[in-house]
């Protein structure tokens, strides 16, 4: 009898809140691009990656893969009612510019664009450039 009661637990429907303005964090590395939509306090609403969008291997690090990832995350962010965003770009990857272009085509009002890429004060030795 106790087993059937535990299986019939009440599940509450998740209420989506309305967020009119937020922040887009773009982490563009050489291998992948991660796009995260947050509210003003930094609570994540939705995210997408180029690897999770169906791209694998070297195609994952292309600007088109970053564009598709932004398109997927923007569709979910519009369900929250987001209209204006501040963009924080982190990293030197190829998906930096195409992600911002896709945000413009998705009709988001971009309030500010900030580059928050870390600059080493003579920290780790950078990887050696490939000679192909």
Swiss-Prot record:
GO terms for cellular component: ribonucleoprotein complex; ribosome. GO terms for biological process: translation. Keywords: Ribonucleoprotein, Ribosomal protein, RNA-binding, rRNA-binding. The keyword rRNA-binding applies. The keyword Ribosomal protein applies. One of its GO terms (molecular function) is rRNA binding. Located on the platform of the 30S subunit, it bridges several disparate RNA helices of the 16S rRNA. Forms part of the Shine-Dalgarno cleft in the 70S ribosome. Part of the 30S ribosomal subunit. Interacts with proteins S7 and S18. Binds to IF-3. Belongs to the universal ribosomal protein uS11 family. This is Small ribosomal subunit protein uS11.
